[in-house]
Design a protein with these regions (language model features):
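Beta-strand-rich structural segments
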Residues: 86-90, 129, 154, 165-183, ...
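Short, hydrophobic beta-strand segments
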Residues: 116-121, 212-232
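N-terminal amphipathic/hydrophobic targeting modules at extreme N-termini
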Residues: 263-264, 270-274
Length: 275
């Protein structure tokens, strides 16, 4: 069958077609086609079941946004000398790849196929620079990570509403001693919550059979997630994440008044009124 790039091109070159429907925005449980057990969910979403962005997210962004952008993939943690297929998702007219400050060449960008390189792995930083009309307009980079040393918690919400069963999403990652995210980490992360109840955990792994209602989760691609529902009367919701041989982390989200006593659901830094 056609690739997504082919499909987008066939729509884009036909001005009488008003748009297209992307299936799917998110991965979901079931329908692991064409994969079989142990897969228990789809793998063709542009975001996984936790809402973590896949590389396909940036391909879509390159197709649909006018703002200059460039995304480099994959990560930069491989065996020394291994040939790595380096690709870019960009809406720029040219892209230049650098390894540890040395240019590996500038390429013209085809709108649909974009550009790629084959690079022998060498520890350090891989940087991609995007150009439009010969001017640098954006860049992206990935660096080699050492062993994970510290947990990082990033609340997806700035606040939580009191007295309305509001919930907070906490995203978990790990970094090395230099502060570089470790994309290959799969540590088991354990959670405790103060001022709320843990109602779900996840990591976006379509092959994971771990319980979603639990107080721990392995990292997948260096990430996992915990969702906490605020307890009645709690002033804050605090989550602590721990793991063997890693420095623990704690994050707190403050409660704000919900004067109308409405019920909200929370998604991606937004609070949507339910009733």
């Amino acid at each position: 069958g056609n690739t997504y790039r082919d499909g987008f091109k066939q729509v884009d070159i036909r001005p009488h077609i008003m748009g297209l429907f992307i299936w799917t925005g998110f991965d979901y449980r079931g329908e692991p086609t064409p994969f079989e057990w142990p897969s228990i969910g789809t793998q063709f979403g542009i975001m996984d079941t936790c809402g973590f962005k896949k590389d396909a997210f940036y391909l879509n962004k390159a197709f649909f946004t006018d703002e200059p952008m460039i995304h480099i993939l994959p990560h930069w943690n491989f065996a020394y000398g291994e040939e790595v297929h380096v690709m870019t998702h960009t809406n720029c007219s040219e892209a230049e790849l650098f390894l540890n400050g040395k240019s590996l060449g500038k390429k013209n960008i085809d709108k649909y196929d974009m550009a790629d390189w084959f690079v022998p792995f060498e520890k350090g930083t891989l940087k991609m620079v995007g150009y439009i009309d010969g001017k640098e307009v954006c860049s992206d980079e990935v660096s080699t990570a050492n062993s994970a040393k510290k947990i990082v918690i990033t609340p997806q919400n700035e606040f939580v509403y009191d007295s309305c069963d509001d919930a907070v999403i906490f995203n978990i990652s790990v970094i090395d001693e230099n502060g570089v995210s470790v994309p290959t980490a799969d540590n088991l992360i354990k959670f405790t919550a103060d001022g709320g109840e843990i109602i779900g955990v996840g990591n976006g792994n379509p092959n994971s059979h771990e319980a979603d209602k639990a107080e721990e989760r392995h990292l997948f691609n260096g990430l996992c997630q915990v969702i906490v529902r605020q307890s009645d009367g709690a002033e804050n919701v605090t989550v602590t994440a721990t793991s063997d041989e890693l420095e623990s982390a704690t994050a707190t989200v403050k409660s704000v008044a919900n004067e109308n006593k409405k019920i909200f659901i929370t998604f991606s830094n937004k609070h949507f009124l339910c009733r």
